[in-house]
A protein has these predicted regions:
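Active-/binding-site microenvironments in catalytic and ligand-binding cores
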Residues: 2, 24-355
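N-terminal secretory signal peptides and thylakoid transit peptides that target proteins
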Residues: 1-17
Length: 355
């Protein structure tokens, strides 16, 4: 694959992929190669689609009309969190600073993922014995290393660079010790407010959770659409449940760096066709092993780098699954307010479904 340049894409009219090219073959292969992924990174690219200076990527698909339509989905006023509790050290552990902050963190791990480290620390100063009759404040300091497999977090497009570039052709040199100079989380500083749709794949297959390395294919997504009675529309936030947390409760942690259920690479093409704005899951999106030799996480690679599509990793979708099944409604209002941290390549988040 030759390096993709902004000049090349913009000269082609700002859209790297014609509708005819997307539809070629009308199939979603299950035997992609690294060469296929490199080709799709060009063909499916959104670089230049929203202008040469765009940093929002597929968030552009969440229009004012989309937000109004999403608000109309609220009938019961019931809110459901899709986030895990912060992965704090257990009582009695040594705690300690996070990576890059002066030392190694305490060992732990929530539901597994290779790194058995604590991703959060909280230091609090409790009231002293002489403060009973005083008005006193209790303060704490929270630090978090959120990327990885233990914390519900958002990946901004700048979380991944490939061949010296990030989404929309910005150079790798835009990074510094102050973070990402382009494509950071600030493109979502006004919050996310759109229709969310849940793909409950274990319910589709009649199992409590998927196998440890079970792949989800486009055919599964379309079968769930038919069963649940909705269709992904432009601007939708797509959440995919694998049943990870049920599996963790029953069998113990998964090492997500070695083996995890998740989406097969060809699902990116389908998501691009449908106009999804955000992709999230209770795992880290990609099935592992990826089944694409030489490409460890093709979903991450194509979604972040080529589509400019933010990702929500490690969501807890169990309460959402129950709430949706109870109502037989798998579409809902999704709200999410990322922290406004200039240069951040993402951040811990608490996505909320409102029915």
């Amino acid at each position: 694959m030759e390096p993709i340049t902004r000049r090349t894409l913009l000269a082609a009219g700002g859209v790297a992929l014609s509708g005819e090219a997307i539809a070629a073959g009308g199939k979603y292969p299950r035997d992609l190669t690294k060469e296929d992924v490199d080709r799709w990174m060009k063909e499916l690219s959104n670089w230049g689609k929203w202008g040469p200076n765009d940093q929002a990527g597929t968030i552009n698909l969440i229009t004012n009309a989309k937000r109004k339509a999403a608000a109309a989905l609220v009938r019961d006023g019931v809110c459901v969190s899709m986030a895990l509790d912060a992965d704090l050290p257990k009582e009695g552990s040594t705690g300690g600073p996070l990576p890059g902050m002066g030392g190694a963190p305490a060992a732990r791990g929530q539901g597994g993922g290779g790194a058995s480290r604590t991703t959060w620390t909280l230091t609090s100063r409790p009231p002293g014995p002489d403060s009973r009759d005083l008005a006193a404040y209790v303060v704490d300091t929270i630090a978090v290393s959120y990327h990885g497999n233990n914390t519900t977090h958002l990946d901004a497009p700048s979380h991944l660079y490939y061949k010296g570039q990030i989404y929309n052709g910005y150079p790798q040199s835009s990074y510094s010790d102050r973070g990402a100079g382009k494509d950071d989380v600030m493109s979502m500083k006004n919050g996310i407010f759109t229709r969310g749709v849940l793909f409950d794949i274990p319910k589709l297959k009649g199992v409590p959770y998927l196998g440890d390395d079970e792949a989800i294919y486009v055919e599964d997504l379309e079968a769930w659409e038919k069963k649940a009675g909705f269709r992904v529309e432009p601007g939708d936030a797509v959440l995919v449940r694998t049943g990870r947390w049920v599996r963790v409760r029953e069998k113990g942690p998964l090492d997500l760096n070695r083996s995890t259920p998740g989406l097969y690479a060809s699902c990116v093409k389908w998501l691009r066709e449908r106009g999804a704005s955000i992709l999230g899951s209770d795992v880290v999106q990609d099935v592992r092993p990826s089944r694409v030799e030489g490409v460890n996480q093709p979903i991450h690679q194509m979604a972040l780098h080529s589509l400019g599509m933010p990702l929500i990793d490690n969501a807890d979708l169990e309460a959402l699954s129950e709430a949706a099944a109870q109502r037989r409604r798998w579409a809902y209002l999704l709200t999410m307010n990322p922290l406004r941290v200039p240069g951040a390549t993402g951040g811990p988040v608490n996505p909320i479904a409102v029915f």
